[in-house]
Amino acid sequence: MSDTSTGYSDPNITPPMGEAVPLGLQHVLAMFASNVTPSVIVAGAAGLAFGGAEQVYLIQMAMLFAGIATLFQTIGVGPVGARLPIMQGTSFAFVGVLAGIAATQGLGVALTSCVIAGLIHFALGSVISSIRSWFPPLVTGLVILAIGLYLIP
C-alpha cells in the first residue's frame, strides 16, 4: 500500500494545524453523535419526554462516563488502558435489548441490567484470551449484522 495519497508514512507525524483542526473537529462531532443517539433511543423507548430532565440526565451521564473511559484508555491506570488516543463511549450493540427492557420493565430495570452486564463484562475481560476461539469472524459478523438490522425500523 502506498502512502502517496496522504504523504504521511509515520503514524507519529503531527499534521499541520490547518489539517489537524478540521480533522479533530470532525472526530469530536462523530464522537458526540455516537454518544448521544443511544441515550435518546433508550429514553424514547422508556417513554421519557423528548428534552425532558430524565433524558437530559441520561445524555449527560453517557457523555461523562465516555469522557472518564476515554481518559482511562488514553492515560492508563495500572493494567487498564491502551495508552493511546482511543475514544470510548456508548455502543449501539446494546440498544435493541435495552430499549426492549426499558419499554416493558422501565428505565430502572434497564439501567440495573447495564450495571450487571458491566460487571460480567469486566469479569470476562480477564479470561478473554482463552475464550477468543469461541468467537470466530462468522459469529461476530452475524452479531453485528443483527444489530444493524434491528436499527433499520
Regions found by a protein language model. Give the residues of each.
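Membrane-embedded alpha-helical modules
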Residues: 101-153
